[in-house]
């Protein structure tokens, strides 16, 4: 992948494998940084006819333990067959202003490979109702007051403040449309005006 790739206002759904796959291979080395902004990933790993396919991650942000500072921000992952957001062993990915909801595996899983330093960034993230508790155990400093992670039963921040579906305008997906401002989800997973990180 060459330099300067940026996805803005894109949707990936019902792909046989992952929605976004930013995999780097040991054989070929690191790919260039990719920025994913105001994007949506849902129902990946599940074809539109109901058959399952590959891994089924929403946003896969790396691979083979190779560090690339890919950025994911202002984006949403829901209903993916595996994880909503995964570093896939990239120890340097950046995740900001992201909602990950009701994915079959982890909503958020950030981990590396080998003994290299973990340099993840995780800010203003909401994770609710994942298939398992979010995985940030390799860099516990990611747990902050402005990040709400799913522990398998509830979503809370570093202080222990809990949130639930009530922070959203709606949790019923009714499709999407494209507008000049991005993707309109008709209130689905939109934060209410009175919610403050």
Model segments located where?
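Acidic-enriched, low-complexity/disordered segments with a strong bias for Aspartate over Glutamate
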Residues: 17-21, 49, 55, 64, ...
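Extracellular beta-strand/beta-solenoid scaffold signature
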Residues: 1, 14-28, 49-64, 79-86, ...
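Intrinsically disordered, low-complexity segments enriched in small/polar residues
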Residues: 2-4, 10, 27, 43, ...
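Right-handed parallel beta-helix
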Residues: 1-16, 30-48, 68-83, 92-104, ...
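Acidic-and-aromatic substrate-binding clefts and catalytic sites of carbohydrate-active enzymes
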Residues: 89
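Acidic, glycine- and Ser/Thr-rich low-complexity intrinsically disordered tracts
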Residues: 115-197
